[in-house]
Amino acid sequence: MKNKIAFVAVGQAGGNIGQLFEDRGFNVLYINTSQEDLDTLEHAKYKYHIPGGEGCNKNRRKAKQLVIDDFDRIAAEIETKIKADLTFVIFASGGGTGSGAGPMLIDLLIDEGRAIGAITIVPGQNESVKAHIILTTVFQS
């Protein structure tokens, strides 16, 4: 089962959840615009830093542009690191990197003919209004 399912963990929240899966033996590729966040994933086997940003600070548009600018390298990372029958993309829908890059990466993987699932982390009741607005835009796109 662990060879048939893999994960692409996007952003800080996605990375935190991805670690739980990697700790249980699943293959996980961590993608983030923040090198600092990637550095907290001490035992991660595969990490990719999207250049040009040190986090997106709830700026979904910035994350989307960084993915567009680095699209070929991100696609190559996924192609070489993620070999599975089913790939889940994990991302927060109320942040910056995850909410901007997560849906784009799902589209990339679907275009490659992969079977995809999404694990979307929604903002809690105590999170900012901005996080809830971002959530709405993620599900509208």
Give the role of each language-model region:
Residues 1-141:
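Tubulin/FtsZ superfamily GTPase core signature
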